[in-house]
């Protein structure tokens, strides 16, 4: 006869299920606490910044990838893994043009897919294709087929080419469907402020990459003359311009976010992009008006900042024209 503890009907199997359920419940509880805690964004920025400072972006992507898998599998909120997921892509700028260095990270793809399937098995949602779905589908097709009559097959399958064609095409469509379906659920937090926090953290991650490039050049040469050439400056400019308004929105409740806006603006200027200066100045001016209308700063303070910015532009004009 079987021992009672090995009885699959009510013994061993029931205990195993209870143990697994208890373990997953704790894992899920810790994931939700981390996602909703104040430590969420600082921890992610610390991980990304530490690995970028050490010059080990591949290991940083692995670390962030493990966090993504944990949050995806254990947290019911699909927004939780978004920030570390995109931070991993921002860290790849340190090997821009040499994305083959990240091929070992492909080992994270199977557990990532399994975590995604597990997430929708445990917390199922009804997929919804919103009004932008058809437009994004057409953009995805255009992205995949664009340049097919010009570039060679070898160029098309290069890691950097696949990164853009798949990421900006099919990847954006998949993300849109997932989040369009998921964001209809009720939440215990302000969704707008949480989105702003995610963009703010991504902007700070990109700013850290730019500032670390200058710090390493200064440590290597003892001084930094002019603006460094950054191979990823257009990419960095796009990320920073997108994220720049977010700290000003968050500063309505916490003035400390204005420092974050200043760091992003500094990194934007150091990218060496003329479009960064032009559009960055426009965004900062609009953000200043936004802060004034909400009583964060006075009209006199805004005028003083505008005059100081104008003097700085005139002083830096000759240098800017040389870029």
Residue ranges and their predicted role:
Residues 53, 207, 308-322:
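Transmembrane signal-anchor helices characteristic of membrane glycosylation enzymes that use polyprenol
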Residues 113-116, 140-147, 211, 288-291, ...:
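Hydrophobic membrane-targeting signal helices
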Residues 1-148, 184-193, 250-255, 297-305:
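Transmembrane signal-anchor hairpin modules in multi-pass inner-membrane enzymes, especially those
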Residues 54-59, 98-107, 164-165, 226-242, ...:
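Membrane-interface micro-motifs in multi-pass membrane enzymes
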Residues 93-97, 147-156, 214-220:
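Juxtamembrane "helix-exit" motif on the non-cytosolic side of transmembrane helices
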Residues 37, 46, 138-141, 168-172, ...:
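Hydrophobic alpha-helical membrane-embedded or membrane-associated segments
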Residues 67, 171-174, 190-221, 230-294, ...:
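Alpha-helical transmembrane segments of multi-pass inner-membrane proteins
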Residues 105-112, 133-146, 156-180, 238-239:
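Aromatic-anchored transmembrane helix interface
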């Amino acid at each position: 006869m079987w021992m009672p503890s090995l009885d699959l009907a009510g013994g061993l199997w029931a205990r195993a299920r209870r143990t697994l359920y208890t373990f997953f419940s704790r894992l899920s509880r810790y994931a939700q606490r981390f996602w909703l805690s104040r430590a969420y964004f600082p921890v992610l920025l610390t991980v990304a910044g530490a690995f970028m400072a050490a010059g080990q972006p591949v290991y940083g992507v692995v670390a962030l990838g493990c966090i993504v898998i944990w949050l995806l599998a254990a947290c019911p909120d699909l927004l939780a893994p978004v920030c570390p997921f995109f931070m991993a892509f921002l860290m790849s700028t340190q090997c821009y043009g040499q994305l083959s260095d990240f091929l070992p990270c492909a080992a994270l793809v199977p557990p990532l897919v399994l975590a995604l399937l597990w997430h929708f098995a445990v917390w199922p949602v009804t997929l919804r294709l919103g009004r932008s779905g058809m437009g994004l589908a057409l953009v995805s097709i255009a992205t995949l087929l664009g340049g097919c009559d010009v570039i060679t097959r070898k160029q098309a399958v290069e890691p950097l080419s696949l990164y853009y064609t798949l990421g900006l095409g099919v990847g954006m469509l998949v993300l849109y469907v997932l989040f369009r379906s998921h964001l209809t659920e009720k939440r215990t937090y302000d969704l707008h402020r949480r989105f702003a926090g995610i963009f703010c953290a991504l902007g700070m991650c990109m700013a850290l990459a730019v500032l670390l490039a200058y710090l390493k050049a200064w440590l290597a040469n003892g001084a930094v003359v002019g603006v460094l050439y950054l191979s990823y400056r257009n990419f960095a400019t796009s990320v920073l311009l997108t994220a720049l308004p977010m700290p000003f929105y968050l500063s309505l409740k916490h003035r400390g976010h204005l420092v974050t806006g200043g760091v992003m603006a500094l990194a934007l200027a150091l990218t060496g992009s003329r479009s960064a200066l032009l559009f960055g100045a426009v965004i900062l001016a609009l953000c200043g008006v936004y802060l004034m209308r909400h009583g964060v700063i006075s009209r006199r303070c805004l005028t003083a900042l505008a005059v100081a910015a104008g003097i700085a532009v005139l002083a830096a004009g000759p240098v800017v024209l040389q870029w």
